[in-house]
């Protein structure tokens, strides 16, 4: 057994861990060990580097933990996919590259919780900007010199993108030119974490590329964290496995758990921190009975509303193997063409009821009919809307199955457990149909493929959701910030009741944000990095942002085509 000592040990080189490793080692007298269970970020592997190849990493286990849920009781008892990234970059290495920060009111709502007063949107915005370099330049809402490359969709990529945005506006919803700017609500272009050369902008590329040459950072891949070590109530180190070899590293200052919403509570529980009764079931010595570890688990669930496309403008030909070498060659040589986009270049956020204070439904538009993981491709020209609710009241949990770090935990999201879930998904399907029947899509829209035009009643829509809805791959909130009985960490990520231990990743969100989670996770890590370093927080940015204040969710009077009567 080998033993080394560092100031900080970071468990997990994902979206948050890479931020911390980079920022902490900016101080040359600080030493950091970064442990990652997966392998390196192979820059010549098109599966992770080509934006259009985003489905490939989910189809194997090289880059994907490939978790599976327990049978979900409200989803026909399906065991559902729960992919998480494995390798330098974590889930930013395998995600869909959609750069969505969330709604300003997400963070203002966090700040109403005891102890989280400094997590308002205006407190968080400087850290979003610090992390970002946007290709069209900085402004009041966007950064111009950060590690993460953000590309904004440009007109003319595919006529279906503009048609779908126009259709949303024709249906009476707002248009917005920036889903991460003044107004998230509405339809418009999507920002994406893609470099100017058409490569995936993971946190391994953006952050670790600048930090890995520093002598005070050691990165160890294929290193699976087994347990956090404690000296009384103080975290003192980590034991980890590299194949059959066990090693121990000691932390002079802190252990930073950045393993994500599934693996972070799993590691804490395996180390004796979690619900005491759960730990005793596995004969794990209890360091601290902390009941919230693994509880409050949240995710976004989504479904695909799919249509036949009457004109040959979809990506259907790109799915054919004989067209892919040309696409790959253009991407490899020039960083351009179909391979250089994730093809989520338009989307939006809407409220389905006037009394919703901020958007409760998200759209990703895609100019092909296919599942996110590349399965179930429709054999024709088609297009689809990925649509799902944003703040489900349902709550799940992550529970340790065994003391073996190689065993996956028991995961239950408890999807669709509340009446509000069903109402929102029915509303979402019906709203999507109203959008799709607008004139902007007349020349493209063929028959509805899924759920199908005959699926109309509440009972029929519910059956479709139970059978076909899938994860949006946004697990979060399982080690939440706060000061209530189920909170795990404080506003700086410090684990309650223990010293020298923090959790910094999407698991500490108290409530899931409105949209994709990579950008908020990076922001959280940037913000807490300043706390760890003892730096003065970045000054609040005093900019306006849209608040509905009870305004109608949809201007039906201005809709080009009025709602169908059923």
UniProtKB/Swiss-Prot annotation:
Matching Gene3D superfamilies: FAD/NAD(P)-binding domain, Glucose Oxidase, domain 3
Keyword set, alphabetical order: FAD, Flavoprotein, NAD, Oxidoreductase
Reaction catalyzed: choline + A = betaine aldehyde + AH2; betaine aldehyde + NAD(+) + H2O = glycine betaine + NADH + 2 H(+)
A single GO BP: glycine betaine biosynthetic process from choline
Binding of FAD, residues: 7-36
Cofactor(s) named in the record: FAD
Gene Ontology CC terms, in alphabetical order: membrane
Active-site residues, as the UniProt record annotates them: 474
Keyword Oxidoreductase attached: yes
EC identifiers of the protein: 1.1.99.1, 1.2.1.8
Listed pathway(s): Amine and polyamine biosynthesis; betaine biosynthesis via choline pathway; betaine aldehyde from choline (cytochrome c reductase route): step 1/1
Cited Pfam families: GMC_oxred_C, GMC_oxred_N
Enzyme class, broadest EC rank: oxidoreductase
Record carries keyword Oxidoreductase: yes
MF terms in GO: betaine-aldehyde dehydrogenase (NAD+) activity; choline dehydrogenase activity; flavin adenine dinucleotide binding
Annotated region described as Disordered, given as residue ranges: 180-202
Domain of life: Bacteria
Physiological role: Involved in the biosynthesis of the osmoprotectant glycine betaine. Catalyzes the oxidation of choline to betaine aldehyde and betaine aldehyde to glycine betaine at the same rate.
Similarity comment: family membership: Belongs to the GMC oxidoreductase family.
Listed name of the protein: Oxygen-dependent choline dehydrogenase
Gene behind this protein: betA
């Amino acid at each position: 057994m080998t033993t080394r000592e560092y100031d900080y040990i970071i468990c997990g080189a994902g979206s948050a861990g890479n931020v911390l490793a980079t920022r902490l080692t900016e101080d040359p007298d600080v030493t950091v060990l970064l442990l990652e269970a997966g392998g390196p970020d192979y820059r010549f592997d098109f599966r992770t580097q080509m934006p259009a190849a985003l489905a490939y990493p989910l189809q194997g286990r090289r880059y994907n933990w490939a978790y599976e849920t327990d049978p979900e009781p409200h989803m026909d008892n399906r065991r559902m996919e729960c992919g998480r990234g494995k390798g330098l970059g974590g889930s930013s290495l395998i995600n869909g590259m959609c750069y969505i920060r969330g709604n300003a009111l997400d963070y203002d709502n966090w700040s109403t919780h005891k102890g989280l007063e400094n997590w308002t949107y205006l407190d968080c915005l400087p850290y979003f900007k610090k992390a970002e370099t946007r290709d069209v330049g900085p402004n009041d809402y966007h950064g111009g010199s950060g590690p993460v490359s953000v590309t904004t969709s440009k007109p003319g990529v595919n006529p279906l993108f503009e048609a779908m945005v126009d259709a949303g506006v024709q249906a009476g919803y707002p248009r917005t030119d920036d889903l991460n700017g003044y107004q998230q609500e509405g339809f418009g272009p999507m920002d994406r974490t893609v470099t100017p050369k058409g490569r995936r902008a993971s946190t391994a590329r953006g952050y670790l590329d600048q930090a890995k040459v520093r002598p005070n950072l050691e990165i160890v891949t294929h290193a699976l964290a087994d347990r956090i070590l404690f000296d009384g109530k103080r975290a003192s180190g980590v034991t980890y496995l590299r194949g059959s070899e066990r090693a121990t590293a000691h932390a002079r200052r802190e252990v930073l758990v950045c393993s994500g919403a599934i693996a972070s509570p799993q590691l804490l529980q395996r180390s004796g921190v979690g619900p005491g009764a759960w730990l005793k079931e596995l004969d794990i010595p209890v360091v601290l009975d902390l009941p919230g570890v693994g509880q409050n688990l949240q995710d976004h669930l989504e479904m695909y509303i799919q249509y036949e496309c009457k004109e040959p403008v979809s990506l259907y030909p790109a799915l054919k193997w004989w067209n892919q070498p040309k696409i790959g060659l253009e991407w490899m040589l020039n960083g351009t063409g179909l391979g250089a986009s994730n093809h989520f270049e338009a989307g939006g956020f809407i409220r389905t009821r006037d009394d919703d204070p901020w958007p409760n439904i998200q759209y990703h538009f895609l100019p092909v009919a296919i599942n996110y993981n590349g399965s179930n491709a429709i054999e024709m020209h088609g297009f689809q809307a990925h649509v799902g609710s944003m703040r489900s009241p349902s709550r799940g949990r992550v529970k340790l199955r065994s003391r073996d770090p190689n065993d996956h935990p028991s995961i239950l999201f408890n999807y669709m457990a509340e009446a509000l879930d069903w109402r929102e998904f029915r509303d979402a399907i019906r709203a999507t149909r109203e959008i799709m029947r607008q004139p902007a899509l007349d020349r493209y829209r063929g028959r509805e493929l899924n759920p199908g035009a005959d699926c109309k009643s509440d009972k029929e829509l519910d059956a479709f959701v139970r059978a076909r809805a899938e994860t949006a791959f946004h697990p979060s909130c399982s080690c939440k910030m706060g000061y209530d009985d189920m909170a795990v960490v404080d506003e700086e990520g410090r684990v309650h009741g223990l010293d020298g231990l923090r959790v910094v990743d999407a698991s500490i969100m108290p409530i899931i944000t409105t949209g994709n989670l990579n950008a908020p996770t990076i922001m959280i890590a940037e913000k807490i990095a300043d706390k760890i370093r003892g730096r003065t927080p970045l000054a609040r940015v005093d900019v306006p942002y849209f608040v509905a204040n009870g305004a109608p969710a949809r201007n039906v009077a201005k809709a080009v085509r009025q709602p169908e009567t059923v």
